[in-house]
Amino acid sequence: MNVQNRISYAFALVAVLALAGIASSLKLQDFADDLFFSHVLENTTLHDFLIENYNTWSGRFTLNALMVGTINHHNVWKIGIPLSVVILCASISRITVGKFDLRITVLSVFLYLFIPKEVLANGSWWVTGFYNYLLPAAAMAYSLSVFIRKGSVGWIEGSLSLLCLSLSCFSEQTSIATLAASFFLIVFCREYRRSFSYVYILSAVVLTWFLFSAPGNFHRFQEETWRWMPGFESESLVTKIIYGYDRIHQAIVMPNSIIFSLLCTLCLLLIYRDEQRTKTGNFFALVLLGHLVLMLLIRLGVAHLGESFYNSDLLNPHRWISYSRYASYFVTSLVILGVCYALAISAIRDNEYIKPFSIVILGFATVLMVGFSPTVYASGMRVLYLWAVMILSASCFIFYRLYGNDRSLINNVIICAMAAYVLSI
């Protein structure tokens, strides 16, 4: 075993210990969804619950079956949560490198732990959130890591990938992301036009149709509208888009949105490394730099820009009519355009950058679509979970394309990430 392998295994051990420490602190909550689903089978059978739930509340058939069937077996989710994080991060490394890479996996794990705590608490460490957000995200990442592999796909790996669709395509955000990503790759990359890809897309379409065609979806929409946002069905398209963008705005300007700041930093590097940089590139570089400076000042508590501008609090009647709120929307939209510009220009030079470009676009789309639900605000921070994971994936991809050949730099970055995590505990 050479020195580099020993270093990689040492990093992996630290990552495992970090996840084990988190897993040891996990527990079922004695209220809300954890309480409901842990007792739901006391007066009914699993079969009857699933049929009734599909017809009256949700199309998440397989996820609900897995959740209510295993939630009272604590070892299932105590092991399943950290294992899903590992599968998710290992899949990110496969998408990034083209094969499993231990160091990129470890780096992904520690960057994952820097996703805003409120988002992780809702989408990853909360037991019900694990079944509905982390698990389908991990399944999506694995299935796409197989789909994105060039050349023929072995029948074992292909079967596992299709099996994962039975989880990822039974969650609204991951099902849309899976379908969109696979369609995008087939349209723009000829190497993915193969028999497995068409079987994959057909399977995803059928399962997604099963999810969205559930009779319970309409009933749930009516119930949630009455409970959380009466009159939502009569809101205009523009209003619903504003609701969705307000959640995007929140994700971008949260003081602890470290992952998105990392993406902005990497995109800034892409622009500055462009030898054919134009005035447009300089403008977006200035936008990204300005955003990073503002976020640093907000993070340090030096800058407080009011109740609306670069404030992560959600819309209320006061902010709805505030000019500074819409100015904040405008600035953050420029930041998003700056990220997309950097990736689009890079994709022209290097076709591989199509992947992070599409990941970022889809990530924002998964949040924007939440604006069409009356629970756009009631759902809390968990609706930002998939977005954060996709921003993490894009960041890892860009970092590897820029510095993948510099092992010492990767080692140093991993050490810094580990140290920062330890200090944040």
Go through the PLM ranges and name each one.
Residues M1-A20:
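Start-transfer (signal-anchor) and selected internal transmembrane alpha helices
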Residues A23-V76, Q173-I176, R190-A344, A365-R382, ...:
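Transmembrane catalytic cores of multi-pass membrane glycosyltransferases
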Residues P82-T105, Y142:
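Transmembrane-helix motifs of polytopic, lipid-linked glycan transferases
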Residues A90-S91, Y142-R149, A181-C189, T265-I271, ...:
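Transmembrane alpha-helices and membrane-interface helical segments
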Residues V109-F147, S322-C340, L368-S395:
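Membrane-interface micro-motifs in multi-pass membrane enzymes
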Residues R149-S166, R194-L202, R407-V413:
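Short hydrophobic alpha-helices at membrane interfaces in multi-pass membrane enzymes
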Residues I156-F183, V206:
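Membrane-interface alpha helices of multi-pass inner-membrane proteins
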Residues E157-G158, A285-L289, I336-L337, Y341-V360, ...:
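Signature aromatic-anchored transmembrane alpha helix within multi-pass, membrane-resident enzymes
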